[in-house]
A protein has these predicted regions:
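Register-specific beta-strand positions within repetitive beta-rich fiber domains
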Residues: 1-32
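Extracellular receptor-binding modules and their adjoining Ser/Thr/Gly/Asp/Asn-rich linkers
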Residues: 10-11, 26-167
Length: 167
């Protein structure tokens, strides 16, 4: 069995292929995309000592960004700045998101509600202007700073046309 041990700063150019496991202790940075059959995180369990917690990344045919939260209606309405509500600088949401959709759910009552997004402002309105229910909301926007992917292609993973479009 061959082994490669690297210490210190190392620069590699060109394609690097490895079979088997690779462990990186510390920070790794890519300027392109990471292509994998699945991607997961594995962290120390936040509640149970000695346990680990694993989750798989959400996968989709679009580069969607998901923002969510809760709000309480005042006089049947609530407005949320998606930037401020998610700790982002004003203008960030509009700069990186296109094809925006919102989803709303009334968590504490039966009053009908609807949501709309204009720029970074999510407006949630109830059917009645006296509603003070708590609403869960989710806004999804497709990244506009990268090209759309080609979902299906013919060939092997090395032929993937998306390897150059997501950088």
């Amino acid at each position: 069995m061959s082994k490669l041990h690297v210490e210190g700063t190392t620069h590699l150019e060109g394609a690097v292929t490895t079979r088997g496991n690779m462990t990186i202790g510390g920070f790794a940075s890519w300027s392109g995309s990471i292509v994998a059959t699945s991607k997961l995180f594995d962290i120390k369990h936040p509640v149970t000592d000695g346990s680990r917690l694993s989750h798989v990344c959400i996968e989709a045919p679009r580069a969607d960004l998901i923002y969510r939260g809760k709000t309480t209606l005042v006089a049947g309405i609530s407005t949320i700045d998606v930037n401020v509500g998610n700790g982002m600088t004003t203008g960030t949401f509009e700069a990186i998101c296109d094809n925006v959709q919102c989803f709303t759910t009334n968590e504490t009552g039966w009053t009908a509600i609807k949501g709309s997004v204009d720029g970074a402002t999510l407006t949630i309105q109830a059917k009645t202007n006296t509603c003070t229910d708590t609403i869960s909301w989710m806004v999804i926007g497709e990244r506009k700073d990268i090209a759309s992917i080609q979902v299906e292609y013919i060939g092997t993973k090395e032929d993937n046309p998306n390897l150059t479009t997501l950088t």
